[in-house]
C-alpha cells in the first residue's frame, strides 16, 4: 500500500486538553499536505478548522460525549446538532459504557438513536471503548450499531487504559459485516500497527501520529 492510499484511511487527530489554535491550524495544514481523510478535533475548534479547510477536500470530524460517554443522551444529541451546524462533517460519539455494564441495552440503543437522529444524515461513528468491554459486550454493542445502520463502530477514545487491538477490530468487523465501517483508534503510532489494523478489517484509522505512519511507508517504499 502506498502512502497516498493509507493517508485516506487516517483521521488526523488532536483531542488533548492543551491544544492551542496554532496546534489546530498546524493539524489542518498537515492534513492538507498529506491528503488525510479528516481532522478529528474538539467542537470548539470547528469554526477555525472550517476556515482553514473549506475547499481542500479534508473533512472535519468532531467528538460528542467525549471522552466518558456518560452525558445525558439529550446533551449528546444537542452537542452533535450544534457541531454539525458549526461545520462538522463527521461525528464520533462515545457509547455509555456504564449502561452497558448495567445491562441496560435498551437505554444504550436509545442513546445512540438520539444522536443518530440529531446527525440527520451526517456520518456517525460510535466509540465502544473496547478496553473496558468483554467480547460479548463488544458483539452486542456492534449488533445494535449494525441494526441502527450507523456509519462506523470505533474502538477507543485513546483516553482510557488501552486503545485498539487487532483482535477487537477483527471481532467488530465480523459482527457488523461489510456495510458498516470500523475505525481503529488509540495507540496507533506506526506503519506496521496501522497495516495490521487495516488487514483485520479497519476502514478508518484515528491517530495523532499520521505523519509518522505514512513516513514509515515512504521509507519502506523508497519514496512518496
UniProtKB/Swiss-Prot annotation:
InterPro entries: Aldolase_TIM, DeoC, DeoC/FbaB/LacD_aldolase, DeoC_typeI. The keyword Metal-binding does not apply. GO terms for biological process: 2-deoxyribose 1-phosphate catabolic process; carbohydrate catabolic process; deoxyribonucleotide catabolic process. GO terms for cellular component: cytoplasm. It is an enzyme of class 4 (lyase). It comes from the Bacteria. It is found in: Cytoplasm. The keyword Cytoplasm applies. It catalyses: 2-deoxy-D-ribose 5-phosphate = D-glyceraldehyde 3-phosphate + acetaldehyde. Keywords: Cytoplasm, Lyase, Schiff base. Pathway: Carbohydrate degradation; 2-deoxy-D-ribose 1-phosphate degradation; D-glyceraldehyde 3-phosphate and acetaldehyde from 2-deoxy-alpha-D-ribose 1-phosphate: step 2/2. It holds the Pfam family DeoC. One of its GO terms (molecular function) is deoxyribose-phosphate aldolase activity. Its EC number is 4.1.2.4. The active site is at 92 (proton donor/acceptor), 154 (schiff-base intermediate with acetaldehyde), 183 (proton donor/acceptor). Catalyzes a reversible aldol reaction between acetaldehyde and D-glyceraldehyde 3-phosphate to generate 2-deoxy-D-ribose 5-phosphate. Belongs to the DeoC/FbaB aldolase family. DeoC type 1 subfamily. This is Deoxyribose-phosphate aldolase. It comes from Actinobacillus succinogenes (strain ATCC 55618 / DSM 22257 / CCUG 43843 / 130Z). The lineage of its organism: Bacteria, Pseudomonadati, Pseudomonadota, Gammaproteobacteria, Pasteurellales.
Amino acid at each position: 500500500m502506498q502512502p497516498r492510499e493509507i493517508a485516506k484511511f487516517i483521521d488526523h487527530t488532536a483531542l488533548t486538553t492543551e491544544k492551542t489554535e496554532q496546534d489546530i491550524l498546524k493539524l489542518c495544514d498537515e492534513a492538507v499536505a498529506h491528503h488525510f481523510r479528516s481532522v478529528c478535533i474538539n467542537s470548539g475548534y470547528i469554526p477555525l478548522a472550517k476556515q482553514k479547510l473549506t475547499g481542500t477536500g479534508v473533512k472535519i470530524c468532531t467528538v460528542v460525549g467525549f471522552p466518558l460517554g456518560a452525558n445525558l443522551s439529550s446533551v449528546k444529541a444537542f452537542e452533535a446538532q450544534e457541531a454539525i451546524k458549526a461545520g462538522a462533517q463527521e461525528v464520533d460519539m462515545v457509547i455509555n459504557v456504564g449502561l452497558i455494564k448495567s445491562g441496560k441495552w435498551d437505554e444504550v440503543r436509545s442513546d445512540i438513536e438520539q444522536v443518530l437522529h440529531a446527525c440527520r444524515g451526517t456520518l456517525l461513528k460510535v466509540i465502544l471503548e473496547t478496553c473496558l468491554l468483554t467480547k460479548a459486550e463488544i458483539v452486542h454493542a456492534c449488533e445494535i450499531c449494525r441494526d441502527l445502520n450507523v456509519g462506523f463502530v470505533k474502538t477507543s477514545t485513546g483516553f482510557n487504559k488501552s486503545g485498539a487491538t487487532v483482535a477487537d477490530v477483527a471481532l467488530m468487523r465480523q459482527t457488523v459485516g461489510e456495510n458498516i465501517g470500523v475505525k481503529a483508534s488509540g495507540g496507533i503510532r506506526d506503519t506496521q500497527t496501522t497495516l495490521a489494523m487495516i488487514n483485520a478489517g479497519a476502514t478508518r484509522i484515528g491517530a495523532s501520529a499520521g505523519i509518522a505512519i505514512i513516513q514509515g511507508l515512504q521509507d519502506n517504499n523508497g519514496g512518496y
